[in-house]
Amino acid sequence: MLDPALLRQHPADLAERLRSTRGFALDTAKLESLESERKHMQVRTQELQSLRNSKSKAIGQAKAKGEDVAALMAEVAGVGDELLHSHGRLTVVQHELEKIYAVIPNLPHADVPLGKSEADNVEQSRWGTPRQFDFPVKDHVELGAPNGWLDGETAVKLSGARFTVLRGPIARLHRALAQFMLDLHVGEHGYEETNVPLLVNADSMRGTGQLPKFEDDLFRIYENEYEGHTDEETGESFYTPTGGVDPDPAYYLIPTSEVPLTNIVRDEIIDAERLPLRMTAHSMCFRAEAGSGGRDTRGMIRQHQFEKVELVTACAPEDSDAEHQRMTRCAEVVLEQLGLPYRKVLLCTGDMGFSAIKTYDLEVWLPSQNTYREISSCSNCGDFQARRMQARWRNPVSGKLELLHTLNGSGTAVGRAMIAVMENYQNADGSIDVPQVLRPYMGGIERIG
């Protein structure tokens, strides 16, 4: 969330910046009208509270003197009614303002190039040279399906579209990749391994910015409503379903472990000595892919359920730029140790995520598509998420509480890494060489198939 003070002080300037960089239309007239009413209702509520307190004090003094207090009590009752109305309206106005604040995207860093789509992203560097094949290249489906290692048909029977069943050596390769990534980030990059829930509450989703804007892309878990009873003989309590369902989701399936990892610092005050906090987790991720249409329907490129190794950092504001470079480099090392050609891209203003001020994407080379595809996205979110979460640290110089900066990145997507390994390490006979760094995780196997 942007600083409400900035929105109050410079609404027109911020509206123009949001329009030109994010394509976001801020209704400044509505914002200023609500802010004016908020100020008025806040002053009026405080005046009424003061008036009620003074009249209540007068009642006590009058009673002590034995005077009739009926008129004063009637006045206090009237003030109380007006206070109730004033406070209620203030609450409504504040809620309306919060709804506006909640859907405003973060402002890009000055280094971020202006643009509307991925076509305007700026390539920063490349690593590795794409392999030249002397035989027809197969995609990951053609490599995995004939042996039953990659089974989309069974997944459709079990669940539906955009799911995959992995078997045998490909399932083992998938697991090996996740283990390799975790070991690298924990053992060499200094991240703390963390095991997080896959189900989180709405506060967690709001904290990292998934709610309210992206609710349609989330899987929601609803709870049945129950009615309480007491056994007349034993006195024990028990519950039976009413047949109804609670209208609000009890939980959300995480779209990325960024959500639970980042929310670990929600409502916390972190000592400066503990910073930076660097955390990593390997988890399932779940996305409805509501806006993906018919894109990437073949194979495992875009799934409802997939696995990812996530990197999250919480740090002091002055360190976030350096931490962003460091995090991105940690993800690059994964691809380099796997021997996968990739390129690093700086996202333009129109292609960045909602919460980010600056994002680097790493795109891995897929021979079957003759192009680079995203495998990691590393973002600096500044204090945007921290303000929503009230995640703070105590500045040892000033002694004051300040908002943390939060960062997140994929280190990397496991399924896409598996696809890249399969395609880049394929042989003419359909077999797949196992990258050197993965062989200890594969029982020494050097080739699949």
Swiss-Prot record:
Enzyme class, spelled out: ligase
Pfam families, A to Z: Seryl_tRNA_N, tRNA-synt_2b
Binding site for L-serine: T256, S257, E258, E310, S410
Subcellular localization(s) per the UniProt record: Cytoplasm
One GO molecular-function entry: ATP binding
GO CC, one annotated term: cytoplasm
Oligomer and partners: Homodimer. The tRNA molecule binds across the dimer.
Protein name: Serine--tRNA ligase
Organism per entry: Xanthomonas oryzae pv. oryzae (strain MAFF 311018)
The gene coding this protein: serS
